[in-house]
Amino acid sequence: MREESWEEHDTIQLTAQRKYLAEVQALETLLTRELSVFLTEPGSKKTNIINRITGKTYALPSTELLRLYEHLEQCRKQGALMYFLERQGTYSGLMLDYDLKLNTNAAPPLESPALSRLCHRIFMHIKNTSVLPEGSHKIHFFFTLKPEVVQGKYGFHVLIPGLKLAASTKKSIIASLQHDATVQKILHEQGVTNPESCLDPHSASVPSLLYGSSKLNHKPYQLKTGFELVFDSSDPDYIPIHQIKNIEAYNLVSELSLTNEQGSLVKPVYCEADIAAEKEEEIPVDDHSLSILMLHDPEARYLHKILNLLPPEYYVEYPLWSNVVFALANTSANYRPLAEWFSQKCPEKWNTGGKEKLEKLWNDASRHTEKKITKRSIMYWAHKHAPQQYKEIVEQGYFSILAEYVYSYNGTLEHYMIAKVIYAMMGNKFVVDVDSNGKYVWFEFVLPGQPMNQGEIWKWRKEVNPDELHIYISENFSRVMDRITEHIKYHLSQPHETNILNYYKKLLKAFERSKSKIFNDSFKKGVIRQAEFLFRQRSFIQTLDTNPHLLGVGNGVLSIETIPAKLINHFHEHPIHQYTHICYEPFNPENPWTKLLLNALQDIIPELDARLWIMFYLSTAIFRGLKEALMLLWLGGGCNGKTFLMRLVAMVLGDHYASKLNISLLTSCRETAEKPNSAFMRLKGRGYGYFEETNKSEVLNTSRLKEMVNPGDVTARELNQKQESFQMTATMVAASNYNFIIDTTDHGTWRRLRHYRSKVKFCHNPDPNNSYEKKEDPRFIHEYIMDPNCQNAFFSILVYFWEKLQKEYNGQIKKVFCPTIESETEAYRKSQDTLHRFITERVVESPSAETVYNLSEVVTAYAEWYNTNINVKRHIALELSQELENSVLEKYLQWSPNKTRILKGCRILHKFETLQPGESYIGVSTAGTLLNTPICEPKNKWWEWSPNPSAPPEKEASAPTP
């Protein structure tokens, strides 16, 4: 690091000077113990002194002002850093602020003759603008200069502290001076390129720095010289000016103060017209909240520098600007001054309602947490646009935080101090939260180039122990500590007084002892323990993977919230922990593996409408939000590809998003409330669950079935864990070689079930005359299903059908026309639900029917039909009545005036009776017979077809063989 840059660290030097300068210690004692009774509220009109270090404001009487000036003068002479301002009161001295632009980096000479001429011209404007009092008066002019030229910019102040003027008079003087050709000529002779615009018009009212004070990380202006001008009203044309001798003998803080009235050299001179002005405009107390924030918050100073790296579009273009504001608001509510400062970088927008827009945006950020971007995004943007400058600022930020600890605690570093710096260095990469067991858990955001498992990139990885931090403390942190050593040695090489050199020697010795600790295992463990509290982000675990539209994939994060899906393979702030190892690639039907799978799907599900419906249904597995309450029951005798397809979906999604479920979950009795159910907990957070290979005639537990297919919250718990409540989000498929037995007549359950029966069988020697027999290919089960290329291709197919479902059916499976599955589901229901079979065969919708049936008449008709067609049994009328109320007849049942249920708008057929004009069977089938859904013949690009009841499918062709 360049030596001269060490002097930029005001905050470090402030800490150090408290240790070795008795004058600074005395000043702090005065402020905290004696002058605290004169503290004022921020914005108070009584304020006359502002301490930028602490942000405190004072209304000091003249006697206390003199005491403060005396302490400040002693600190100034010792070279102490100070940040005190005085508020220009209703009547105060005049300060002129000249901001010069030069053609060179050499400071202009500004010799006494030129400054004397400048004094004369300034006084002429004062005399012409104000009414000077009668008699002879001495008016003093002081010139303070900027210490150095910075990139062709320079400046100086003209202080006329004794002449007490009203703010309006000052403004008039400044306005007339701006157009003074003589002044412009004098400045031009000094090499100034902007003489017409270099005088700051706001210097009449802004708080003025007391002599010896400065802005943060700036050197104070230095006194060049002073002049004494004598004015006598009896001889106004004779105005002698001479240079002040032995000026350093005076208390310059006091003499150069614009508000002091008790100077030894400077005596106040009041203008009569200004004294007579009763209603003088108020001088505003400037808001120094940003300066105060940056003095006390190292991270705010750091962010201020980072924000300066962002290109203009970030404060000009509304979307980018709003993102910056949201990021600051979400990082800390205290960073409002940073947002205001950044917004003001575009004056045109700020002056046309910018403040109001910022106010609204800031409030929106505090209310709407879904747009959770933070300072991490600001860091990313800055690094993206200015990588080298970003690196320098980041390294400087670490150094500043550590240096403040070193100087504050005399070189001794403890666990928390190191942890604080580590947090500044790695706070964007690690997060800690407390899990359900009360343990602190570490998460690391995985970036390219570091060791990882497939799929962890661009996600938050759970760490048992943050090993990277352990290594970082010993290998990387030591370099920051080496810079502190350089900083201390730099001061040891300077011509300081003996007491200051002794301070730095002791500091270096203590710090060297602290440096060795970072290689000690037990010390590092202590640092990590302290870091847990700093890295803690409450409820972080609860926010992980809560966005159902975001899916962790092998090459990043896939967002399916928009169409088309978007792969996020760069920095982001989505809290994603789970993932599948599959890499997302956009759907490409020309990909050989995609062609292979499209052909396989065509073979496994020969009916085009059923194939599309099932693929639409399976595609919803990539979405983990609330879905339509459906479950697919897939019947097949074996060797028909259903198991391959279900397993492929599960393998593609991975264990985080999919789960194979134990069939006992559907067939066993429900556990009692206090018992654990690990099988049911497997559905928590999953987008897909499947059952397979059941025994013959398995009876499904209808209460569990309802719980699994109905939307809403469910409760369960793992072994030795607390009861949890979660939402059912899984797309579920149950496959079997035998039909399930579902002993319920509840229409609410049946309408959530879909049934499909496999027609195809894969054989070693298929019958060429049987279109339902296909040549088996063992590679699908033993080779292809494990191949990453096959898995990637199938994942792209799932995403393709998800996008198609959103675009063409608004994401609703029930809108997809599929007569094959509708008819097979109806047939399956009738085989299980005799009440439904009776309704679909014997009850017809008849709008013109005049007959109204009591519910008891419907019960009797069903009992007679059942005894004739099924089996003779004793029926319980009350149970049958309840079942009818929950059947498909529900919408036709009404209440009669005597509060009994009646069936209206329907007619019950007798045996062999036919339909009358205008009547139709209830249900999707026709008189109980299956719809004829033959195998669709070939059609090109079957995956592009959209099922539509008004447009029967065209003939299809097989996808080309890869």
From Swiss-Prot:
Example of a GO MF term: ATP binding
The EC number(s) this enzyme carries: 3.6.4.-
BP GO terms, sorted: DNA replication
Binding site for ATP: G636, G637, G638, C639, N640, G641, K642, T643
Domain of life per record: Viruses
Regulation: induction: Expressed in the late phase of the viral replicative cycle.
Annotated keywords: ATP-binding, DNA replication, Helicase, Hydrolase, Late protein, Nucleotide-binding
Enzyme class: hydrolase
Domain SF3 helicase residue range list: 607-775
Similarity comment: family membership: Belongs to the asfivirus helicase C962R family.
PANTHER family linked to this entry: ATP BINDING PROTEIN-RELATED (PTHR35372), SF3 HELICASE DOMAIN-CONTAINING PROTEIN (PTHR35372:SF2)
Stated name of the protein: Putative primase C962R
Source organism of the structure: African swine fever virus (isolate Tick/Malawi/Lil 20-1/1983) (ASFV)
